[in-house]
């Protein structure tokens, strides 16, 4: 069974990099480019995991995470935050709002994302 991942990312370049990496593992990737469409896609498609950027053009990733975790129909879906923000307080905020992991976008971002997905049993 192929797992479905929802990526909420406004950078086309970053989304393509992640898409290419996850395709190597046979994962189905849905992409939303802003917070509102990411929230709607989560409710509509019920992905196995949401990979969520923090800095989005409308709702930020923290607000999207809070909305998912406050909706009893989708609160069970794990959320991994993948973001440029790498300060300790950002990581703490991400985990406090319900993310299961918080990954900075650096040279190891895709590799760390794959490892996080392994830990969740998606790979």
Segments predicted by a language model, with ranges:
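The feature encodes the CheY-like receiver
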Residues: 57, 66, 75, 87
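Short hydrophobic/Thr-rich beta-strand motif most characteristic of the beta2 strand and flanking loop
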Residues: 26-33, 41
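Charged docking surfaces used in two-component/phosphorelay signaling
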Residues: 16-24
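Active-site beta3 strand of CheY-like receiver
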Residues: 45-51, 56
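Conserved acidic carboxylate
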Residues: 9
